[in-house]
């Protein structure tokens, strides 16, 4: 199941879904870090909500490929990133030269605010047309799946099975206000035949609990707080590789596919414009994709 580029109707539904919340996200992953050469002559500010492991590897790879650019990184959840961008706009203007998000919905809203500089990147024939616009480009394909506690029986076979009384109070959901991929899932279920807002209402009625972030879903299932959850397949794979007692449950009606977009902002000017374009080229290159 592929998530489309943008769903304007999803935001009101985010406010109406009414799934029980456990609390707001904390900015534990937000930081200002840098990867640079001591002789750096250009500065680049990156705002991102991608996983820490991903951004660390990519920025380190870029520093090796282009040591003349110093990259300062602000990483946070999608909700915190949106708040930072709004604060920038109310205090002198956007400070990010590049924004790298985890869902197309949030990036589309930034594009509508005219925060991005249109630039058709050259030499990127391998990027599917569905994963790029005039303003931003898809960098990684993400999949939302079900994570289950190891040994759980019976296992759910479909997304709708999460509303079964057999799993009452045992399902964890990521907060759409904090996690871009969770927001994308909300947008998908809103428009998918057989789901709609009623799916979230059924989850709520079945005792599903909303937690702060995508990684927290996996952690809570691993620790036995819940038996099931909705999360990214990459988080489940990493947890399994680390020995966590969880398994990945790929629904028979399909995982939810979305992409992680990146864009140059209108704040990137002069040398920052050159650095931003170099960074985008790297992220979308084979080296950046394999970082």
PLM regions: where:
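Bacterial signal peptide processing site
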Residues: 23-25
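Extracytoplasmic ligand-binding site segments that recognize negatively charged/polar headgroups
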Residues: 45, 49-56, 76-82, 94-226
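Periplasmic-binding protein-like
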Residues: 129, 141-143, 169-177, 200-204, 210-211, 282-291, ...
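Short, polar/charged alpha-helical segment
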Residues: 39, 44-70, 80-82, 86, ...
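C-terminal motif of bacterial Sec signal peptides marking the signal peptidase cleavage site
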Residues: 18-21
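A bilobed periplasmic-binding-protein/Venus flytrap-type ligand-binding module shared by bacterial periplasmic
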Residues: 145-152, 187-190, 259-272, 291
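A ligand-binding cleft/hinge motif common to bilobed small-molecule-binding domains
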Residues: 105-109, 227-247
């Amino acid at each position: 199941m592929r998530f489309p580029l943008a769903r304007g109707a999803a935001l009101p539904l985010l406010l109406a879904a009414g799934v029980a919340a456990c609390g707001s996200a904390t900015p534990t992953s937000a930081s200002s870090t840098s990867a640079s050469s001591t002789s750096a002559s250009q500065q680049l500010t990156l705002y991102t909500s991608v996983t820490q492991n991903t951004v660390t590897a990519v920025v380190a790879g870029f520093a090796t490929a282009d040591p003349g650019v110093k990259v300062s990184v602000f990483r946070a959840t999608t909700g915190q990133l949106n708040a930072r961008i709004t604060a920038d706009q109310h205090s002198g203007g956007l400070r990010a030269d590049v924004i790298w998000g985890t869902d197309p919905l949030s990036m589309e809203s930034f594009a509508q605010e005219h925060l991005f500089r249109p630039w058709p990147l050259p030499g990127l024939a391998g990027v599917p047309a569905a994963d790029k616009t005039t303003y931003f480009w898809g960098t990684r394909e993400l999949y939302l799946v079900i994570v289950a506690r190891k040994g759980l029986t019976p296992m759910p076979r479909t997304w709708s099975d999460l509303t079964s009384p057999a799993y009452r109070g045992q399902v964890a959901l990521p907060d759409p206000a904090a996690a871009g991929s969770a927001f994308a899932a909300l947008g998908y279920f809103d428009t998918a035949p057989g789901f709609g807002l009623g799916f979230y209402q059924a989850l709520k009625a079945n005792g599903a609990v909303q937690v702060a972030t995508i990684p927290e879903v996996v952690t809570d299932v691993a620790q036995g707080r819940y038996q099931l959850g909705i999360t990214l397949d990459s988080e489940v794979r990493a947890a399994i590789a680390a020995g966590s007692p969880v398994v990945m449950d790929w629904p028979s009606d399909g995982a939810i596919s979305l992409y992680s977009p990146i864009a140059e902002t209108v704040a990137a000017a002069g040398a920052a414009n050159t650095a931003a374009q170099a960074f985008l080229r790297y992220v979308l290159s084979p080296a950046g994709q394999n970082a």
